[in-house]
Structures are given as C-alpha cells and as structure tokens.
Amino acid sequence: MFSQHIEKARILKKEVDSNLHRIKETKEIFTYYSLLEFRYQMLSGNFENDLEGFEFIQDQSDSFLKYYYHFFKFIYATEVGNYSSAEYHYERAEQLLIIILDEAEKAEFHYRVALYYYYLSQPTLAINHVNKSLDFFNENVGYETKVGACKNTLGMACVTLGQFDLAEEYLVSALNTFQQENEERPALTVRYNLGLFYADQDLSELAIRHLTSAFKQFGHPKEPYQKRGTYVLAREHFKLGNFKEANFYVEEGVQSCTKEYIYHFTILKAMIENESLEKLEELVLEAISYFKEHELFKDIQVYTEELAAKWYGAGDECKAGKYFYMSYEAKNLLKEKGRLK
C-alpha cells in the first residue's frame, strides 16, 4: 500500500482476507489487520467510516500499532477536511516516528505531511516534506508510483507559489509515470490537477475542459480530495457567465463534500444568484468563523479581499478598509504558519 499500487494492494488483500478466521484468533494481529483494512479503504477512495472502536490503542505503551493508529487517523482527518483533528494525530504520530525503523514508512509519513500542508496552503512546508519523501522513493526500486505521487504534490505546491512553469514540469512528469505504470486512477488525479493548474492562471476554458473530463471519469461517489475540482468547475463556469452549468456543479458538489467546501459552495451559489452584498457578507462571515477554527488563512485572505473590493465599489470605504485589513492579517498569519521550523 505504501508504494501506492492500488491493484496489487487489492489482490494482496484478498489473500489476507482468506485467512481472516486465523487472524481473529490473536487480538494484536487482528488489531493490526483492522488498521491496515482502514488504510486500504482510504487508498480505495472509501472515506465513509472513521477508525472507530480502536481508541483503546491510545492508552497502550508506545508501539507500532499506536503509531499506525495516529498516522491513519491523521490521513483520514486530512482528507475529510478536519484539520484540527489532523493536527492532533499528526503531532502524536510524529512523536512515535522514532520507533519506526522502516525507511519506507518514514518516507510515507513525510509524503502525507506534505499533502496536509498543501491543503492548508502552506507550500513551502509541503515541498520540504515531500522532498524528504522523494529522497527515499527515488533511490529505491519498486516505488515508481510513489515517485509520481510526490511529483504530483510538488506540482500543486508550485501552483500555490505561482511557479507555473515548474508546476507543469512536475505534473507532466507525474502523469507520464502513472501512465507507464498503468495506474489509471492516479493518472486521472493528475489530469484533474492540471485543471486546477489552468484555473489558477485564469485560463477558464482550458480548466473546464480538463476538469469536466476528470469529473465524468471519476464517477460517483466523489472522493473527498475531488471536492475542490467540482468547486473550481462551478467557479470557472460562473466567471464565464455560464450560470446554468455553474449551478449544476454547485448542486453536484454539495452532495459529497466536506464541511469546509459546503461554505465555498454556499458563497458561490449566492454569487450566482446575485444575492445582496449584505447577504454575501453574512455568508462569508459564517465561513470565516469555520476557517479560523481550522487555520485556513488563505481562504480568509481571499474572501475578505473580495468583500473589501465589493464594499469599495459600493461606496462604503469604512467597510472596505475593515476587510482589506482582515485580508492583510490573514496573509501575515499564513506566512507565519508556513515558515520552516
């Protein structure tokens, strides 16, 4: 599973499941199996169930089971957008990393931490961790798919930094790797990210073309990390004045997204329906309360800047100044959080 070969993991799981009756005879082995089963479900795109019923592991002495418990809970919380919980389990897994001797597992830890920081719009920290991961995967045979995953993450971190030439280089390299390894789903993920890459450059039509293709091929239900793609599809259609299409993707998005993106979709829907500025302000302030709780300072920066511009256009310089300052504060907090430790 660490090498991210989904089909190979599926075959291996079938072999292990055939001996499940024996596994259940020993509590520690069954606990280990259950943790890996949870990890497999996430690898397969199933995030419906959290790791419940295994809280007792937290009270045990330090062990690899305790590490896996916190590490897998960290992955789950990151993917479903519960960043406060993710931070809690990340810190505890990091404390236990010292007892993990397998360098592949340490590399996997840094890869997952890189994704976490990417989701929090902290690209410098993301790049720092993904390079630690890539150092191992590049030097060892059998991790080609993982190398592709790391390059995909590097590409998206570069998008966040506005380094689009370098971002394209990483994303295309990742796509080539996945295609050579016949990994269709990861390759589709890169195509989806290419849509985000074009959207960040205000190339709406190109973004829509890539994202629409990925949206159709991914099918239902949508995985948590695809929430942004659906949102960006709606947003780019809105920017082009395609309100019917924008509404369609808003409705699709709210069916299977995290709480974080419920706020994004709700605000976008208000803009599509041309709600009053007062109503839009109310929705943004509700969202900001949530974003502050989870330290999503980039979102706070963007929305308060938009509110500032709208209030300035409406002739209310007092409110415009208030929101410009909030945007400035969020930008500084984001910069502070993103510094290398």
Language model: regions and residue ranges:
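Tandem amphipathic alpha-helical repeat scaffolds
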Residues: M1-H5, S34-S44, Y67-N82, E108-S121, ...
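Alpha-solenoid helical repeat architecture
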Residues: E25-F30, S61-H70, L101-E108, V141-A149, ...
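Amphipathic alpha-helical segments of tetratricopeptide repeats
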Residues: K14-H21, E52-D59, E91-D102, N131-G142, ...
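Helix-coil-helix junctions within alpha-helical repeat/solenoid scaffolds
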Residues: G219-K222, L233-F297, E305-G315, A320-G321
